[in-house]
Amino acid sequence: MACKTLTCSASPLVSNGVVSATSRTNNKKTTTAPFSVCFPYSKCSVRKPASRLVAQATGDNKDTSVDVHVSNNNQGGNNQGSAVERRPRRMALDVSPFGLLDPMSPMRTMRQMMDTMDRLFEDTMTFPGSRNRGTGEIRAPWDIKDDENEIKMRFDMPGLSKEEVKVSVEDDVLVIKGEHKKEESGKDDSWGRNYSSYDTRLSLPDNVDKDKVKAELKNGVLLISIPKTKVEKKVTDVEIK
């Protein structure tokens, strides 16, 4: 077991009625001196497992499907989809390890998408209601599930209606925009205004059908479904000489 040394200083105790800090017995002046204290410590640390909840849309709501606009513009210029570069931080995700090792696999793109969304939504103050009041746990306001036939995305947007959300596909970039404005008036002629907005841009993999993207908003939860296309692998035998 190792020890750490803590260096600190101690001063004489002064009480009421004491005129000076000089000892009456030996007439010597008391001074402050440093001393050392050793505390044993262990290098072992305990990490608490992170809890993860998934939001589900339940009940009836007037919000239905959200229109998805697709636009292609490959004539000159680069793609205007912007990437956000901040510290990487990932949450739990079921990803095949082969997809992470294969540089040509679409799962590599999906991993980048999740990292981007995690950085975009790491500020939980953007939209309220990200904490479970019953357990006090904080859940991610987004989720992605990669199936064999489609990619499913979930975004929590409490307080936003269908008219305040826009989903579009620009070339190979999925664009999600939301804007919410609300004015409140109180007593004594006081009033306030709430405003929240965001613009998310995600690069889509090559093995998806960008013309058949579907979006639906229910109970403040945006659900996006992107069907996959079948990619035939071309195999060519190489003669060994």
Swiss-Prot record:
Keyword flag Chloroplast: yes
Chief place of localization: plastid
GO terms, biological process: response to heat
Domain sHSP: 133-241
Keywords assigned: Chloroplast, Plastid, Stress response, Transit peptide
GO cellular component: chloroplast
Pfam families with a match to the protein in the record: HSP20 (PF00011)
Gene3D superfamilies attached to this UniProt entry: 2.60.40.790
Localisation: Plastid, Chloroplast
Disulphide-bonded residues: none
InterPro entries xrefs: A-crystallin/Hsp20_dom, HSP20-like_chaperone, HSP21-like
Highest taxon above the source species: Eukaryota
Family statement drawn from the similarity comment of this UniProt entry: Belongs to the small heat shock protein (HSP20) family.
Protein name: Small heat shock protein, chloroplastic
